Amino acid sequence: TYGSQLALGALGITIVYTVLRFSNFAHGEFMSFGTMSTILLTWVFIDSNIKLGTMPTAIVVLPISIMLTIIYCLLVDKFVFKFYRQQKSKSVIALIVSIGVMFFTGGLIRFIIGPGDKNFMDGERFILKAKDFKMLTGLDEGLTIKSTQGVTIILTIILVILLFWFLNKTKTGKSMRAYSDNQELALLSGINPERIVLITWIITGTLACVAGTLYGLDKSYKPFTYLHLVLPIFAAAIVGGVGNPIGAIIGGFVISFSELLITFAYKKFFFYILPDNF
């Protein structure tokens, strides 16, 4: 599931880099903003006793928090990035500006919701419990599947399929690809650049909100965590090939396995096979 979350985050960074030509270091805070919106709405829905059975209430409010995240991304573009785009500033300038946006957004989030841990998971935590798995299979070892893991995998598959269908099959998606390949030629072909920018931020805001919310549900929400999450997300985008959406997805899983499998799983393995005085 961590790989799915990194993949969605890396896709958001890749879309901005490919179309708008800069590395958006504020993407982690956009994810945090989307998660914060989900948390606040979840608390409201829980107080109103609006739930979705065994699934987390956060899934119910996710469409609303996606809209709020998109609006925030569009406001940031309108009042910050648009100026530098009109000035035809170099990519490195936009990158530095995105770092400023990152710190501003992080401060805004901590001002609204505070810097501490926020747990917004409710509903049934497990789709399959270890003892139920043992009873079904007769095996000695148990297997546990959390509801957040199931939701993460399903939403990731749906979003990836929809994104690639949009980019490859729709007129707007093809216009975005043409604009990213050659902006001057795309403008001569009658493509509206402002519309392309609008759609880009809509996609970015959606991916950021979903990825951030799924990460917060699976672990817990703490604003500073998303600041640090930028590094593995960028690593995933780079490993998969900068500007390559498919590579971003693969990179997300490569980085997640590198972090979780190599960093943690093999510690116990080497602890048992190496001499005590090693």
Where are these regions (language model features)?
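Single transmembrane alpha-helix segments in multi-pass membrane proteins
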Residues: 1-41, 79-89, 93, 237-245
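Hydrophobic core segments of alpha-helical transmembrane domains in multi-pass membrane transport
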Residues: 35-40, 65-72, 99-109, 155-164, ...
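Transmembrane helix-bundle core of multi-pass membrane transporters
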Residues: 83, 92-169, 264-278
